[in-house]
A protein has these predicted regions:
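Short beta-strand immediately N-terminal to the Walker A/P-loop
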Residues: 32-33, 82
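The feature captures the beta-strand-to-loop junction immediately N-terminal to the Walker
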Residues: 35-37
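Short coil-to-beta microelement around the adenine-binding A-loop and adjacent beta1/P-loop entry
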Residues: 16-17, 74
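Conserved Walker
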Residues: 43-44
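ABC-type ATPase nucleotide-binding domains, specifically the catalytic core motifs of the NBD
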Residues: 14, 32, 93-112, 120-123
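Conserved ABC transporter NBD signature motif
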Residues: 4, 58-66, 78, 110-114
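Helix-to-loop junction immediately C-terminal to a conserved catalytic motif
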Residues: 50
Length: 124
């Protein structure tokens, strides 16, 4: 089942489009990576999906619900998140403590999710 869809995403900064007509779909449970050179629009795509950057065209759909106009903090509550390319972690904290910080808005117990992450990435 496809859980997150970006249709015809067009967005940019200062009136200049950085991404144009991007289509993206992610199935439930998938880990998705966007790879490309500096300035290719990777962060722009992610910011658009998260609502941190307004689209000039396109739609974002999550679990069959239109969320294009939804605030970023409400998208996080749905479980939509990304890890930016910069080193945006708390260096004085352990991996587990950083994961807990990332899940602070969740209402459920995140311990099961953290265990799944350790199974996926045992080197952590």
């Amino acid at each position: 089942m496809i859980s997150l869809i970006g249709k015809n995403l067009t967005a940019g900064y200062g009136g200049v489009d950085i991404i144009n007509n991007i289509h993206l779909s992610v199935k439930e449970g998938e880990i998705t990576v966007i790879v490309g050179p500096n300035g290719a629009g990777k962060s722009t795509v992610m910011k658009s999906l998260l609502g941190m950057l307004n689209l000039t065209e396109g739609n974002v759909i999550f679990s069959d619900n239109e969320i294009t106009q939804m605030l970023p903090q409400d998208r996080v509550k749905l479980g939509i998140a990304f890890v930016p390319q910069n080193q945006n972690v708390f260096t004085g904290m352990s991996v587990e403590e950083n994961l807990e910080m990332g899940g602070f808005l969740r209402k459920d117990n995140i311990l099961e999710t953290i265990e799944e992450i350790y199974q996926l990435f045992p080197v952590l």
